[in-house]
Amino acid sequence: MKRFLATALLGLALCGVARAAIDTYEFASDAERERFRNLTQELRCPKCQNQDIADSNAPIAADLRKQIYGQLQQGKSDGEIVDYMVARYGDFVRYKPPVNERTWLLWFGPGALLLFGVLVIGVIVLRRRRTAAKVQTTLSAEEQARLANLLKNDK
């Protein structure tokens, strides 16, 4: 009975592997294959959070790979293919969105935050230095004499 259960579980486990889809495309040249690979790695899967369509197992990613392959076969340029995908799915489909009025915060926000942080730290350091300088006072003549006396007695 244990042997039967082990065999059944192994069979079920292998069913999932056998069902995994592997896309096979025929290319006329290695350059075309490289273009396909670059395009599928450059474009993000609309369904997946942070995965390109080359690595995604989502059904929409498989459809996008087929569309890219079809457009490559039609002789379209990389720019035309990317423009088609952006027109259909928006700038989200690109890993490197263009700099425009809608994406300026994405491009310049991190640098602005870093600059703001450096300014805040600089202001804090300057204020502490000024406060420390005000706290240091000179010793009166009586205090200096007492200090000198204490130092003499230590020797």
From Swiss-Prot:
Lipid bilayer topology: Single-pass membrane protein
Alphabetical keyword list: Cytochrome c-type biogenesis, Heme, Iron, Membrane, Metal-binding, Signal, Transmembrane, Transmembrane helix
Pfam family membership, one: CcmH
Keyword Signal annotated: yes
Signal peptide: 1-20
Location within or outside the cell: Membrane
Gene Ontology biological process terms, A to Z: cytochrome complex assembly
Keyword Metal-binding attributed: yes
Membrane-spanning parts: 105-125
Molecular function GO labels: metal ion binding
Organism domain of life: Bacteria
The family this protein is said to belong to: Belongs to the CcmH/CycL/Ccl2/NrfF family.
Task performed by this protein: Required for the biogenesis of c-type cytochromes. Possible subunit of a heme lyase.
Identification of the protein by name: Cytochrome c-type biogenesis protein CcmH
